[in-house]
């Protein structure tokens, strides 16, 4: 609707919109000023992510909440590879299924230099993915890396401790 042309924040938590819902948001000519998009628990899959990463509706996005959806390593890789989120400060993918492949895609992406908060809890990420994220040079502003509820072990703890004690 043209009445939404100045809309900056959308919160559609728990509406089970599915791929058609995100498709509508991605393709709307009236949502080009979005700064916050909260789509928790909406059964969003990689099909939606594929549309999202080519849409110019998200270039002003600062907060993207896609937690508790159906995003796999392929969807995470698509998100990591797009340069259409230059202002993104918060990315929440908690409780998806991105695994180590998705974590590695984010760790090697140069597209999130402004990111401050990254939530990847409950994503089946192991030490391999977690250590790579912790040691990544591509998150210069990161303040929070949430890896809760993943099967992590000593290697992750040691990597985090090593990074936190550099220069001391």
Where are these regions (language model features)?
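Intrinsic disorder/low-complexity segments
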Residues: 2, 6, 77, 81, ...
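Leucine-rich repeat
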Residues: 2-9, 29-36, 56-63, 83-90, ...
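Terminal export signals
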Residues: 6-9, 19-23, 51, 151, ...
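Consensus "Asn ladder" position of solenoid repeat domains
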Residues: 15, 39-42, 66-69, 93-96, ...
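The leucine-rich repeat
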Residues: 17-26, 44-48, 53, 71-78, ...
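Ampipathic, surface-exposed secondary-structure segments
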Residues: 92-123, 132
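Leucine-rich solenoid repeat scaffolds
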Residues: 127, 131-168
């Amino acid at each position: 609707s043209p009445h939404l042309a100045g809309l900056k924040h959308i919160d559609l938590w728990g509406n089970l919109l599915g791929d058609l819902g995100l498709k509508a948001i991605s393709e709307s000519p009236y949502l080009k000023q979005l700064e916050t998009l909260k789509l928790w628990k909406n059964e969003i899959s990689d099909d939606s992510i594929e549309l999202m990463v080519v849409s110019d509706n998200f270039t002003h996005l600062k907060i993207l909440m896609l937690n508790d959806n159906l995003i796999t390593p392929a969807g995470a890789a698509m998100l990591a590879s797009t340069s259409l989120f230059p202002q993104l400060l918060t990315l929440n993918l908690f409780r998806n299924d991105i695994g180590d492949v998705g974590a590695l895609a984010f760790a090697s992406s140069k597209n999130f230099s402004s990111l401050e908060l990254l939530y990847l809890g409950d994503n089946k990420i192991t030490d391999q993915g977690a250590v790579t994220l912790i040691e990544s040079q591509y998150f210069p502003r990161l303040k929070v890396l949430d890896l809760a509820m993943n099967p992590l072990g000593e290697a992750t703890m040691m990597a985090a401790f090593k990074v936190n004690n550099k220069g001391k």
